[in-house]
């Protein structure tokens, strides 16, 4: 329900996926939920790929995959919240494409949305973690608004529980072994 209300807003959608589970982190019918709002496609956890992987080819593969889901992003970024790769560029792109409006960060559970938001907040000079992060699905229970200014916010949305994600079928001990850190 919360995701579908974004279609009624005039905002930027920052769609975060996990590069190690691209298929499991795609949202079928995303366009239906977000309406005509522009989508900034953010592929997280790029630090876990070998440096020898051609980033341009990786980006092209991701964009082809997005197109299969009917997603035509205004831009695609390869980032790492954990290692702070491309975080400043992500903040610049969010500011460029949001045009003074709100930006909603959306994605399935465990793709690193809250970690990315914490790094973005740190990039603008704040210290500490504003948003709780966890390896367990569903940590963000409600929408969290972080003000950009007095008229607009960066909005962290709860992760969508996706049955195709393997993490929903693992015990705590197993999750620690398989979730990349």
Question: Could you describe each region identified by the protein language model?
Answer:
Residues 2-75, 87, 150-151, 179-181:
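Conserved C-terminal guanine-recognition region of P-loop GTPase G domains, centered on the G4
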Residues 24-25, 114, 163-165:
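Short helix/loop capping segments that flank catalytic or ligand/cofactor-binding pockets
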Residues 40, 48-111, 118-134:
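Canonical P-loop GTPase G-domain recognition
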Residues 18, 114-115:
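Acidic, metal-binding active-site segment of PIN/NYN-like and related structure-specific nucleases
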Residues 22, 83-86, 137-141:
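Short acidic loop-to-helix transition motifs that present clustered carboxylates
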Residues 1-13, 37-40, 46, 131-181:
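Helix-rich effector regions associated with P-loop NTPase G domains
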Residues 18, 121, 158-159:
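Short glycine-/small-residue-rich Rossmann-like dinucleotide-binding loops
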Residues 113-114, 178:
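Short amphipathic alpha-helical patches
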């Amino acid at each position: 329900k919360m995701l579908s209300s974004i279609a009624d807003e005039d905002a930027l959608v920052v769609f975060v996926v996990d590069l190690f589970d691209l298929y499991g982190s795609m949202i079928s019918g995303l366009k239906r939920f977000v309406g005509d709002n522009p989508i900034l496609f953010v592929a997280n956890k790029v630090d876990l790929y070998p440096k020898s992987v051609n980033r341009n080819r990786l980006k092209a593969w991701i964009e082809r995959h997005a197109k299969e889901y009917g997603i035509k992003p205004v831009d695609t970024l390869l980032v790492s919240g954990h290692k702070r790769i491309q975080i400043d560029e992500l903040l610049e792109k969010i500011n460029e494409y949001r045009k003074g409006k709100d930006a909603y960060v959306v994605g399935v559970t465990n793709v690193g949305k809250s970690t990315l938001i914490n790094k973005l907040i740190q990039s603008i000079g704040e210290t500490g973690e504003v948003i709780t992060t966890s390896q367990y699905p569903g940590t963000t229970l409600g929408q969290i608004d972080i003000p950009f200014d007095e008229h607009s916010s960066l909005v962290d949305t709860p992760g969508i529980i996706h049955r195709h994600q393997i993490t929903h079928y693992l015990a705590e001990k197993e999750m620690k072994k398989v979730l990349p850190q």
